[in-house]
């Protein structure tokens, strides 16, 4: 090395040899306009800001949700856009009682929704069957027996403010998810509900139920066919016959 070079010149030569391109120079204006993020965060941010619900309202709970559409609550600020087709929705809001006849339709709508999809069970009737869970044979005692539920919203019915709180909690859940981890919707918890205790009812079209002995059945020997309206005496005889 040339001994006539100054120490500063020698230092510059060494830095140029080790790093010929030099350190990148980023201006202050450019550094303030750069956001570093991950693919998961970007994807979740886009999804939580544009939840498209499919409204499945069957009872009075849906009236409270309909109040959100007005200007007083304005659910558009959360990016909620109601859809009429399950193929365009990613959020299913079940509001009201689910009956046995409507259960297949609910499951079909859920299966037609694309992944990832979420479910909010709104109201006591949706979560446990509500007032119909005690003696009704047609009400489903908990919608989580049919489809997985992400968020339970109790109430009879829940207030619109409670619905907003449920949507905010769901947005937090969506924001913490990962694309690689969420491959399929899986329910991690269940609401404690009572099981169904139903007996098979024989077809009334064939009349087979008349041949089955039960506590409420009438013996065939005491059955009478009434073709015209009986008088008071005949009514008393028929009642005595049925009681005996």
UniProtKB/Swiss-Prot annotation:
| Major localization class | membrane
User: A Pfam family in this protein?
Assistant: Oxidored_q6
Keyword Ligase in annotation:
no
So what EC number does this one have?
7.1.1.-
Entry keyword Thylakoid:
yes
Listed InterPro entries: NADH_UbQ_OxRdtase-like_20kDa, NADH_UQ_OxRdtase_20Kd_su
Compartments where found: Cellular thylakoid membrane
A Gene Ontology CC term for this entry? respiratory chain complex I
Entry function: NDH-1 shuttles electrons from an unknown electron donor, via FMN and iron-sulfur (Fe-S) centers, to quinones in the respiratory and/or the photosynthetic chain. The immediate electron acceptor for the enzyme in this species is believed to be plastoquinone. Couples the redox reaction to proton translocation, and thus conserves the redox energy in a proton gradient. Cyanobacterial NDH-1 also plays a role in inorganic carbon-concentration.
HAMAP family, from UniProt? NDH1_NuoB
Q: Where is this region: Disordered?
A: 213-244
Q: Name one GO biological process term.
A: aerobic respiration
Q: Which GO terms describe its molecular function?
A: 4 iron, 4 sulfur cluster binding; iron ion binding; NADH dehydrogenase (ubiquinone) activity; quinone binding
Record-linked Gene3D superfamilies: 3.40.50.12280
Complexes and interactors: NDH-1 can be composed of about 15 different subunits; different subcomplexes with different compositions have been identified which probably have different functions.
Q: Which reaction does it catalyse?
A: a plastoquinone + NADH + (n+1) H(+)(in) = a plastoquinol + NAD(+) + n H(+)(out); a plastoquinone + NADPH + (n+1) H(+)(in) = a plastoquinol + NADP(+) + n H(+)(out)
Name it. NAD(P)H-quinone oxidoreductase subunit K
Key words of the record: 4Fe-4S, Iron, Iron-sulfur, Membrane, Metal-binding, NAD, NADP, Plastoquinone, Quinone, Thylakoid, Translocase, Transport
Cofactors named for this entry? [4Fe-4S] cluster
Which residues does the annotation say bind [4Fe-4S] cluster?
Answer: 60-61, 125, 156
Regarding the membrane, this protein is recorded as: Peripheral membrane protein
Compositionally skewed regions (Basic and acidic residues) per UniProt: 221-238
Q: Which family does it belong to?
A: Belongs to the complex I 20 kDa subunit family.
The record describes how the cofactor is bound as: Binds 1 [4Fe-4S] cluster.
* Disulfide bond sites: none
Which organism is the protein's source? Prochlorococcus marinus (strain MIT 9301)
């Amino acid at each position: 090395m040339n001994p006539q070079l100054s120490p500063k010149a020698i230092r510059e030569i060494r830095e140029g040899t080790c790093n010929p391109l030099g350190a990148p120079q980023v201006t202050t204006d450019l550094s303030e306009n750069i956001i570093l993020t991950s693919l998961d965060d970007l994807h979740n941010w886009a999804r939580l800001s544009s939840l498209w619900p499919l409204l499945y309202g069957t009872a009075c709970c849906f009236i409270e949700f309909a109040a959100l559409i007005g200007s007083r609550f304005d659910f558009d600020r959360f990016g909620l856009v109601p859809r009429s087709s399950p193929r365009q929705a990613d959020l299913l809001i079940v509001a009201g009682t689910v009956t046995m006849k409507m259960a297949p339709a609910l499951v079909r709508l859920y299966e037609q929704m694309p992944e990832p999809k979420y479910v909010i069970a709104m109201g006591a009737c949706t979560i446990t069957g509500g007032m119909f869970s005690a003696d009704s044979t047609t009400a489903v005692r908990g919608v989580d027996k049919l489809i997985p539920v992400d968020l339970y919203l109790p109430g009879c019915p829940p207030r619109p403010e409670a619905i907003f709180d449920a949507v905010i909690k769901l947005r937090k859940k969506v924001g913490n998810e990962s694309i690689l981890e969420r491959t399929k919707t899986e329910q991690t918890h269940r609401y404690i509900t009572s099981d169904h205790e139903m007996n098979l009812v024989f077809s009334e079209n064939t009349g087979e139920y008349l041949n089955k002995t039960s506590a409420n059945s009438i013996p065939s020997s005491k059955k009478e066919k009434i073709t015209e309206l009986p008088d008071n005496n005949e009514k008393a005889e028929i009642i005595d016959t049925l009681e005996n």
